[in-house]
């Protein structure tokens, strides 16, 4: 990444904020978990306490509401789910153009792994981190790390 890309990433990051995140049962639309916190702050590990019943759902809808001062040509996410530091799953999401001085909501659906591949909550609890890298094209804006606790 060149210094121009880095300074563009720094500029976007300064004006980028997650306002809230919501997880819903994708089938019923019922809210499972909601947090009004800026999970985009880099250089710190965030925590999320999520109801254990989320592990029993066929699919989960994730809604991210964010604001940006700078425009982005191709806003996208690279999301890794790690268990004790090892990658279990990785997803790529692309939103596209985001206008300057806007607040946006991005919703995506994540389907559960087959039941035979699921681990129990007591094994996962505190051992799972979700590492989300936010990009504009290839320019890294920020990287968020959230440790999951099942309640």
UniProtKB/Swiss-Prot annotation:
SUPFAM superfamilies on file: E set domains (SSF81296)
Top-level taxon: Eukaryota
Protein family (similarity comment): Belongs to the PDE6D/unc-119 family.
Gene name in the database record: PrBP
Cellular component, GO, one term: cytoplasm
Subunit structure of this chain's protein: Interacts with Pde6.
Protein known as: Probable cGMP 3',5'-cyclic phosphodiesterase subunit delta
Keywords tagged on the record: cGMP, Cytoplasm, Nucleus
Subcellular compartments: Nucleus; Cytoplasm
One Pfam family in the UniProt entry: GMP_PDE_delta
GO biological process: sensory perception of light stimulus
């Amino acid at each position: 990444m060149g210094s121009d890309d880095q300074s563009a990433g720094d500029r976007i990051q300064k004006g980028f904020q997650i306002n809230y995140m919501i997880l819903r049962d994708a089938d019923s639309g019922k809210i499972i978990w909601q947090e009004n916190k800026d999970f985009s702050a880099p250089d710190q590990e965030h925590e999320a306490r999520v109801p254990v019943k989320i592990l029993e759902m066929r699919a989960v809808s994730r809604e991210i509401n964010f604001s940006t001062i700078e425009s982005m040509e191709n806003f996208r996410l690279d999301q890794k789910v790690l268990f004790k530091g090892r990658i279990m799953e990785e997803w790529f999401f692309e939103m596209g153009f985001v206008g300057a001085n806007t607040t946006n909501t991005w919703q995506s659906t994540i389907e559960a792994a087959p039941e035979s591949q699921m681990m129990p909550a007591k094994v996962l609890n505190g051992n799972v981190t979700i590492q989300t890298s936010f990009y504009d094209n290839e320019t890294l804006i920020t990287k968020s790390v959230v440790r999951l606790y099942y309640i």
